[in-house]
């Protein structure tokens, strides 16, 4: 059977010796297939006490469900996510950081994986398939969405905030923080934001209106977006900066706080073109071994790619902007 040729299928179980019943898996990173794990692995990535473990399982080939992808009927195992079903039938996702649909955070926060499910934009990475589900791959007619925290005024800013603007007495930026990240840093300072998949998602315009309101209220010199990782939902981020830049004075800093892992030259150019004028990149270190420990990325090749892209982004911004 064709799907048996695909890579192994894993589900998640609770290690009760590590679980402290903190409620994170109910209040922040919720399960969308409760009682019948489909292997999205969101809770595995998100659990702050590492109380989730992977267990090798199998695709339920005895219980197939019908799904319609752009009107074409396919039969897939019932115990998979929409994203997994798409991969099983041979549909590839776009690279992380591209404008197309991509599996970026895999925890449901960034919405970069969203497709049209039964006429509504929904995340493919954590949504289980169900019999009769209709999935559309063209999302251009829908406003991009993302889970966002804030805005809040900030005293110190972030990566790339000019040091001379910071006096620790006045608010220097009005900031928002977006959910979802392509790294797995165990020391993440915004853990509750990064792994949030339950909050109501917002459009770039909705967030733009809020952040501009508080920017004017607190008279900050900059507007900032951090995370999580802002760059992994490219459509959303570009539209956010376009909206904000068209409604505030040019002297206002429009600040991107990024890990730089997907900030390619064309991406940087596109952000600058829509008004982003303050790009802060954090490569984190120089050695790939250190990077793997800091970011939680076990795949050395991927870690090397991310580290190299981040440093190249620093150089490109410095040389050109």
Language model segments and positions:
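Iron-sulfur cluster-binding cysteine motifs and their immediate structural context
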Residues: 20, 24-36, 42-58, 112-122, ...
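Glycine-rich phosphate/adenylate-binding loop and adjacent beta-alpha elements
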Residues: 44, 104-145
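Short, contiguous acidic and Ser/Thr-rich linear segments
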Residues: 72-81
């Amino acid at each position: 059977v064709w799907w048996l040729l695909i890579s192994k299928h894993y589900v998640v179980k609770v290690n009760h010796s590590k679980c402290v019943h903190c409620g994170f898996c109910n209040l922040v990173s919720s399960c969308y297939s409760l009682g019948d794990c489909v292997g999205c692995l969101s809770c595995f990535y998100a659990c702050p006490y590492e109380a989730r473990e992977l267990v090798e399982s199998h695709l339920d080939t005895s219980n197939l469900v019908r799904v319609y992808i752009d009107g074409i009927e396919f039969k897939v195992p019932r115990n998979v996510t929409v994203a997994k079903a798409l991969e099983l039938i041979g549909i590839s996702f776009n690279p992380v950081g591209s404008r197309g649909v991509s599996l970026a955070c895999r925890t449901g926060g960034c919405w970069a994986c969203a497709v049209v499910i039964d006429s509504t934009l929904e995340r493919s990475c954590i949504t289980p398939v169900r019999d009769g589900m209709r999935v559309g791959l063209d999302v251009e007619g829908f406003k991009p969405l993302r889970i966002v925290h804030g805005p809040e005024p900030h005293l110190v800013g972030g990566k790339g905030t000019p040091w001379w603007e910071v006096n620790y007495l006045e608010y220097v930026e009005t900031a928002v923080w977006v959910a979802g990240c392509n790294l797995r840093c165990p020391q993440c300072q915004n853990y509750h934001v990064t792994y949030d998949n339950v909050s109501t998602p917002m459009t770039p315009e909705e967030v733009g209106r809020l952040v501009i309101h508080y920017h004017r209220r607190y008279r900050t010199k900059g507007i900032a977006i951090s995370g999580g990782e802002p760059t992994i939902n490219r459509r959303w981020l570009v539209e956010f900066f376009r909206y904000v830049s068209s409604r505030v004075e040019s002297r206002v800093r429009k600040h991107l706080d990024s890990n730089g892992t997907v900030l390619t030259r064309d991406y940087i150019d596109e952000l600058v073109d829509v008004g982003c004028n303050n790009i802060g990149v954090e490569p984190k270190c120089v050695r790939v071994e250190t990077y793997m420990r800091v970011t939680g990325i076990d795949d050395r090749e991927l870690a090397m790619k991310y580290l190299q892209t981040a440093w190249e982004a620093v150089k490109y911004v410095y040389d050109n902007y």
